[in-house]
Amino acid sequence: MTFTASSSSCAITESPVVVALDYHERDKALAFVDKIDPRDCRLKVGKEMFTLFGPQLVRDLQQRGFDVFLDLKFHDIPNTTARAVAAAADLGVWMVNVHASGGARMMAAARDALAPFGKDAPLLIAVTVLTSMETSDLRDLGVTLSPAEHAERLARLTQQCGLDGVVCSAQEAVRFKQVFGAAFKLVTPGIRPAGSEAGDQRRIMTPEQALSAGVDYMVIGRPVTQSVDPAQTLKDINASLKREA
């Protein structure tokens, strides 16, 4: 079934599911999107697709009724990052992110850049430790902490800078909710329904486990985008989350 802009542009989803769009071809991406319902998920656009297809892709998704998480992980000097975040807000995205390792001044500048947008500002999230990274990877970078310890340090800095939350692994979610409170949003990649392959993620969880751990928004990619029936897969995931809740 195809959901057109006219039928779904006002749709609001309560689902915590964010589907990662990872396509090399715009037409294939939109063909997939036209098979799913914006009431069942939000969509994430990352570096590859945004580089290939630009802001118009985001507009195409919004016209179909979807909230968009612009996953570009800005990491630059404060002024440049602030301008990029403001540009994302102008585009009307639902969520945008920066790297917490950019430091406090960069994150504060990004936060301040969203002040003029008021209630229409996107959620501003910081990336802590990429879910593909393990202790050995951090050691190669001169970081002697474990991924969990380093992520918590960066999450604390993020909260102190007034951002809305962090991207973290599901394994860190329980601790983060305890330390940073319920209002601090946790966005988690590496979520895969039981039976899915791990792919290039190293620290993964099922949707049900993630919800129990305190994750607010869970990013799911290939288990949905490569499903023979993605609409039904999304409905099954959401149904399982409602049972878990």
UniProtKB/Swiss-Prot annotation:
The active site is at K73 (proton donor). The keyword Lyase applies. SUPFAM superfamilies: Ribulose-phoshate binding barrel (SSF51366). Pathway: Pyrimidine metabolism; UMP biosynthesis via de novo pathway; UMP from orotate: step 2/2. Gene3D superfamilies: Aldolase class I (3.20.20.70). Keywords: Decarboxylase, Lyase, Pyrimidine biosynthesis. It comes from the Bacteria. It catalyses: orotidine 5'-phosphate + H(+) = UMP + CO2. Substrate binds at residues 22, 44, 71-80, 131, 192, 201, 221-222. Its EC number is 4.1.1.23. One of its GO terms (cellular component) is cytosol. The keyword Cytoplasm does not apply. PROSITE patterns: OMPDECASE. GO terms for biological process: 'de novo' pyrimidine nucleobase biosynthetic process; 'de novo' UMP biosynthetic process. GO terms for molecular function: orotidine-5'-phosphate decarboxylase activity. Pfam families: OMPdecase. Catalyzes the decarboxylation of orotidine 5'-monophosphate (OMP) to uridine 5'-monophosphate (UMP). Homodimer. Belongs to the OMP decarboxylase family. Type 1 subfamily. PANTHER family: OROTIDINE 5'-PHOSPHATE DECARBOXYLASE. This is Orotidine 5'-phosphate decarboxylase. It comes from Salmonella paratyphi A (strain AKU_12601). The lineage of its organism: Bacteria, Pseudomonadati, Pseudomonadota, Gammaproteobacteria, Enterobacterales.
